[in-house]
Amino acid sequence: MNKILVTSDTHGHVAALRQAIVQAGEFTHFVHLGDCTADVEAVRPLLEERGVPVYQVRGNCDYSGAELYREFHLDGLKIAILHGHTQRVKYSLLSLGLFAEQKQADAVLFGHTHIPKVEYSSTGRLLFNPGSLGEPRLGQATFGLLLISREGIMPRIVQLDAVH
């Protein structure tokens, strides 16, 4: 069983990102979906201590050399990650669902809207947004956890505890 900590839209709130890492407990992979990739560098030592692979993409507020799109495989499932602004996710998830189909991804993880969402495309592909740790639109900072096994993917949105 793999457990992925999924974060997005931290926008300089490194303390919230650190809190999510602590609150998530043990996890096998770390994903940051952009805005701001520099925040990942601030917590990279924590992630390296745990021996956790880091996957990140850049968002519309990032100017780093990070890629716009990445994918990886876990337990025979294909996970695609992107920020979402190029797919216009603030307006509709239709193009994201088509993108998932085109890439043959079992799950597409995206950010940009600052609103957590667990949805499935018309072909049953997971479309997952962990919300925002830095500037949540619904008032509560959130992150995501994905439990992945050969049986499938169990998505979960988690509210961030108070940052100390």
Regions found by a protein language model. Give the residues of each.
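Active-site environment of divalent metal-dependent phosphoester hydrolases
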Residues: 11-15, 37-41, 61-66, 87-92, ...
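Binuclear metal-dependent phosphoesterase catalytic core
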Residues: 75, 98-104, 121, 128-164
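A short helix->loop->beta-strand "cap" motif at the edges of active sites that frequently abuts
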Residues: 50-53, 124-125
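Active-site neighborhood of phospho(di)ester-bond hydrolases with catalytic His/Asp-centered motifs
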Residues: 6-8, 29-35, 55-60, 80-83, ...
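Generic structural signal for conserved hydrophobic packing positions in ordered secondary structure
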Residues: 43, 72, 81-83, 100, ...
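Helix-adjacent hinge/juxtasegments
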Residues: 53-94
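Short, surface-exposed charged micro-motifs
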Residues: 71, 117, 145
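N-terminal active-site segment of His-dependent metallophosphoesterases
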Residues: 1-50, 62-68, 140-142, 146-153, ...
